């Protein structure tokens, strides 16, 4: 939880607080390359998360994909574009991701304590045993998926809007992660919480 909530943000905070103000010319020069790398991270890691069978690995890969949004937003701002949408979206995404990913890892930890496995196929029917927990996990699962009216949506949407202002195709590629995020998070939630009971424990 500490890794997801705090440590992952150190690099992005370092960019925002030190690298961008101290080395503005270098930031502007390398911005196109970092924007491309961020898009690769957002899309490719989202695809990797889709095939995970381990809950913890799935949430970990989704965290990497979300942090790709943060670097994308930061360098859309610093690359000479001065895009406020992207910068504000990156900051909101950092804050949101800190709470959401920590909560998701906590949910996985609670389930692991009961069955001592993180394999998605070993779970099912959690809502019948722990309905309040299922509601809690649904709330943060929706935010992790980036569904509207959640904090996860606000940051990603602002970065995408900023990207569209700079280049339509950058924004379109970044928007793919909303599809991936909804796919892997909701699939995991449906299987674990509403799926058939495979283990009565």
Pin down the residues of each PLM region.
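Short, intrinsically disordered, charge-balanced linker/junction segments flanking boundaries
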Residues: 198-201
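Hydrophobic transmembrane alpha-helices and their helix-loop junctions in integral membrane proteins
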Residues: 1-196
């Amino acid at each position: 939880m500490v890794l997801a909530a705090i440590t992952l943000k150190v690099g992005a905070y370092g960019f925002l607080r030190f690298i961008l103000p101290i080395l503005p010319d270098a930031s502007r020069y390398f911005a196109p390359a970092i924007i491309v790398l961020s898009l690769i991270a957002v899309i490719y890691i989202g695809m990797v998360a889709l095939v995970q069978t381990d809950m913890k690995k799935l949430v970990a890969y989704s965290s990497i994909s979300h942090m790709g949004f943060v670097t994308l937003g930061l360098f859309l701002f610093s690359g000479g574009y001065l895009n406020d949408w992207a910068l504000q979206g990156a900051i909101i995404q950092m804050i949101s991701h800190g709470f959401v990913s920590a909560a998701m890892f906590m949910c996985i930890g609670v389930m692991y304590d009961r069955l001592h496995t993180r394999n998605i196929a070993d779970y099912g029917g959690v809502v019948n045993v722990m309905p309040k927990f299922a509601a809690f996990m649904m709330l943060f699962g929706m935010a992790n998926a980036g569904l509207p009216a959640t904090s996860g949506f606000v940051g990603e949407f602002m970065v995408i809007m900023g990207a569209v202002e700079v280049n339509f195709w950058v924004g379109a590629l970044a928007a793919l992660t909303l599809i991936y995020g909804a796919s892997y998070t909701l699939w995991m939630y449906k299987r674990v919480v509403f799926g058939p009971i495979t283990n009565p424990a």
